[in-house]
């Protein structure tokens, strides 16, 4: 029963971004073969979420994720260590794909708009780039930089006026 459930999980995640490009790597078939070799040691629901609709990647990122998955599966196939699949899959879903999604929608990669591929359907759609504040919430935008420069300029100007006044008073004291 567990083998069937695990097989269902692999088929469900077969809609993921890693299967959208580079078909010659046959990742879906290789993942199915690894699944057939697996004795279920883990609960598939804990790691194999079939919902990839929150993720969208550009062409370059999708190829990078596919190549990375190809290399990881090759290592798993050579070692015969199928227990690494859930760890890799969790890392992919929780860390790498969200990072690539953010990079694809933020400057400097994105300029105005970009074509992103939905990771569930593999269909491309033109999307607007995210605003700077959304991409880098802790960073200062151009308006903040202007205010900072004006404050620094004001402080320097004020210290210059104070310094000039002190020098003027010193010169007057020497003349007397």
Swiss-Prot record:
- Does the record bear Disulfide bond in its keywords? yes
Please report the record's description of how this protein sits within the membrane. Single-pass type I membrane protein
Ranges per topology, Extracellular: 17-146
On tissue specificity, the annotation reads: Expressed exclusively in testis.
UniProt xrefs under Pfam families: TMEM95 (PF15203)
The post-translation modification note in this UniProt entry reads: N-glycosylated.
Which GO terms of the cellular component aspect does the record hold? acrosomal membrane; sperm plasma membrane
List residues traversing the bilayer. Answer: 147-167
Q: Which residues lie on this side of the membrane: Cytoplasmic?
A: 168-176
**Glycosylated residues in this chain:** 36, 118
Superkingdom of the organism of origin = Eukaryota
Q: What happens when the gene is disrupted?
A: Males are healthy, grossly normal and exhibit normal mating behavior but are infertile. Sperm are morphologically normal, exhibit normal motility and can penetrate the zona pellucida and bind to the oolemma but are unable to fuse with the egg membrane or penetrate into the ooplasm. No effect on location of sperm-egg fusion protein IZUMO1. Almost all Tmem95-deficient spermatozoa are unable to fuse with oocytes; however, a small but significant population is unexpectedly able to fuse with oocytes.
List all disulphide bridges recorded for this chain: 17-119, 20-122, 106-129, 110-135
Annotated signal sequence is 1-16
Q: Which InterPro entries match?
A: TMEM95
User: A biological process (GO) annotation for this entry?
Assistant: fusion of sperm to egg plasma membrane involved in single fertilization
Q: Which UniProt keywords apply?
A: Cytoplasmic vesicle, Disulfide bond, Fertilization, Glycoprotein, Membrane, Signal, Transmembrane, Transmembrane helix
Q: Where in the cell is it found?
A: Cytoplasmic vesicle, Secretory vesicle, Acrosome membrane
Which family would the database say this protein is a member of? Belongs to the TMEM95 family.
As for what it does, the entry says: Sperm protein required for fusion of sperm with the egg membrane during fertilization.
How this chain assembles, per its entry, is:
Does not interact with sperm-egg fusion proteins IZUMO1 or IZUMO1R/JUNO.
Q: What protein does this entry describe?
A: Sperm-egg fusion protein TMEM95
Gene source species: Mus musculus
Q: Which gene encodes it?
A: Tmem95
């Amino acid at each position: 029963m567990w083998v069937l459930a695990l097989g269902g999980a692999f088929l469900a995640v077969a809609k993921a971004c890693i299967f959208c490009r580079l078909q010659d790597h046959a990742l879906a078939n290789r993942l199915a073969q690894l699944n057939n070799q697996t004795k279920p040691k883990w609960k598939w629901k804990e790691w194999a979420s079939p919902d990839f609709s929150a993720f969208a990647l550009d062409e370059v990122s999708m190829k990078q994720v596919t190549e990375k998955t190809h290399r990881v599966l090759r290592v798993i196939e050579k070692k015969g260590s199928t227990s690494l699949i859930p760890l890799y899959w969790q890392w992919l879903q929780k860390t790498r794909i969200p990072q690539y999604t953010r990079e694809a929608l933020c400057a400097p990669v994105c300029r105005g708009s970009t074509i992103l591929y939905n990771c569930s359907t593999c269909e491309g759609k033109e999307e607007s780039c995210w605003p700077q504040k959304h991409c880098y919430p802790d960073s200062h935008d151009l308006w903040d930089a202007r205010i900072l420069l004006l404050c620094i300029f004001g402080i320097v100007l004020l210290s210059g006026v104070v310094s000039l006044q002190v020098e003027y008073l010193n010169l007057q004291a020497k003349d007397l």
